[in-house]
Amino acid sequence: MDGRIKAIGVSNFLKSHLEALSNITDIVPAVNQFEISPLNTQKELIKYCQDNGIAVQAMSTFSHFRSTEPRLEILENTKLKAIGLKYNKSVVQIVLRWLLQQGIIMIPKTWYIPHLKENIAIFDFVLTKEEMTEIDSLDRGMFLNYNPYGQQQGFFRMVRNNEEFKKWNETHPANFILDLIDQIRYKFSI
């Protein structure tokens, strides 16, 4: 590809979007950023990305715009606390280590220096296979922040009926991708 762009990254792309992209262009995203947490492990999408050479970046692992309940459900989880106690680590450190051991890129957000130091202190222990499985078992498919199944027809048009969107998306996944590629080509003259 001639031009200024050497790599693109995408956000909240589902497997169907990535498949549609690969069907209409030779562009392979360098990274797909999407929500991953113990309550929503996204194993199938992670595997698809990693199998196709797309780096996975976790976002919104702890955040929630509307309520603190799901966030607290992670931070107060007894299984995560027990694992943390074993290593003398916080629940946040356990979850960050869980992401790291899956080969997932993470950018934990903080403005508070003690939290930054806490986030960095995850390289002096390794979770066992059993502990990784135990954390995976918390999965409920619960989005803490952004649910791509309910908010992604065309460019950011809200869809009221999730089932309606899923049906549309299964039959027209390339529409979203084509719109995106056109926007990229227009913006960067490629």
Please place each PLM-identified region on the residue numbering.
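Beta/alpha (TIM)-barrel catalytic core signal, keyed to glycine-rich beta->alpha loops juxtaposed to Asp/Glu
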Residues: 1-190
